[in-house]
């Protein structure tokens, strides 16, 4: 991150570590606009989630549309390329009549999870851009006090439209606003620590729904397997009742059982593959957010968390 250059004058008092210019902050100098650049605000259908949390209803609407498109494509592939055994096997796993009660919910949950994770990834990338803003003075001679805090706050508001919607800038704004109110640093460290815990809980809770989908999708697959087994065994039982010991009829009944097993295990395969892709995407995003958090912790400590570092700057 480049050293901060402050575009602000504070009366006749120069703030250590900041350079004064003749250009006051204004709406035209915004570097990031949450209301225009956040992916959910660009779509504009639903209220944007906090920080990196996606709007669940938006993800569900996208999932319904994607599920409809997916099954339409599968039906087309089956009708146009049924002679291809691979295409036929793939298509039937989804659109076989006995599988639909399982595959439709499983695919819907899959696209819901993937939509939420995609939106979350875009929001995380947008939040990370705040780290590149020249909002924080990093000169070694900078002294944090009530006067300099006001200048930094004005600088932050000149760079973004809504600092409270940025994970990093919201914490900084809260810290400096309290510093301006109480006129000291010692109590700010406690506020920062509480805010940091709230932010971490907010980020962690954004994975709760998709984590639930990771286990619920395979459960749907197992339900489909049980249904297939049940229907096959029931058909075989009826065959035994009417066969009268006829081996040919018994063999035919066993064939129905094996077909039921094949149908049942198709749903499990579909569900496990869906859950695998969801889990891989979750791990990918968690790694990205971990990198973001690491960079976040490496920003100036006097504005973030560590009370000893903060107090050492008080004069």
List PLM regions with ranges.
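Large intracellular
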Residues: 2-199, 306-315
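Membrane-interfacial helix-loop-helix connectors in multipass membrane proteins
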Residues: 84-94, 233-258
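Hydrophobic alpha-helical transmembrane segments of multi-pass membrane proteins
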Residues: 98-111, 213-216, 220-223, 261-265
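Transmembrane alpha-helical segments and their cytosolic interface motifs
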Residues: 54-68, 196-230, 265, 269
């Amino acid at each position: 991150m480049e050293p901060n250059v402050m575009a602000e004058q504070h009366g006749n008092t120069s703030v250590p570590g900041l350079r004064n210019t003749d250009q006051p902050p204004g709406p035209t100098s915004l570097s990031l606009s949450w209301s225009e650049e956040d992916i959910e605000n660009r779509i504009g259908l639903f209220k944007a989630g906090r920080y990196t949390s996606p709007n669940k209803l938006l993800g569900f609407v996208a999932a319904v549309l994607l599920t409809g498109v997916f099954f339409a494509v599968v039906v087309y592939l089956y009708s146009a390329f049924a002679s291809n055994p691979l295409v036929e096997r793939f298509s039937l796993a989804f659109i076989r009549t006995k599988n639909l009660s399982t595959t439709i919910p499983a695919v819907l949950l899959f696209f819901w999870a993937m939509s939420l994770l995609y939106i979350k990834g875009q929001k995380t990338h947008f939040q990370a851009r705040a780290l590149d803003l020249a909002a924080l003075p990093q000169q070694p001679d900078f002294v944090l006090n009530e006067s300099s805090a006001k200048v930094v706050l004005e600088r932050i508001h000149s760079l973004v439209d809504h600092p409270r919607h940025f994970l990093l800038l919201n914490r900084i704004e809260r810290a400096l606003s309290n510093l301006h109110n109480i006129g000291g640093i010692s109590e700010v460290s406690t506020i920062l620590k509480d805010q940091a815990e709230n932010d971490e809980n907010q980020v962690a809770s954004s994975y709760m729904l998709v984590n639930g989908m990771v286990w619920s999708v395979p459960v749907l697959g197992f339900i489909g397997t049980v249904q297939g087994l049940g229907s096959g065994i029931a058909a075989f039982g009826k065959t035994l009742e009417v066969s009268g010991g006829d081996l040919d009829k018994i063999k035919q009944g066993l064939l129905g059982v094996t077909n039921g097993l094949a149908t049942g295990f198709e749903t499990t395969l579909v569900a496990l593959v869906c859950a695998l892709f969801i889990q891989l995407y979750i791990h990918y995003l968690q790694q990205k957010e971990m990198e973001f958090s690491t960079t976040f912790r490496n920003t100036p400590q006097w504005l973030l968390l560590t009370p000893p570092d903060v107090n050492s700057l008080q004069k």
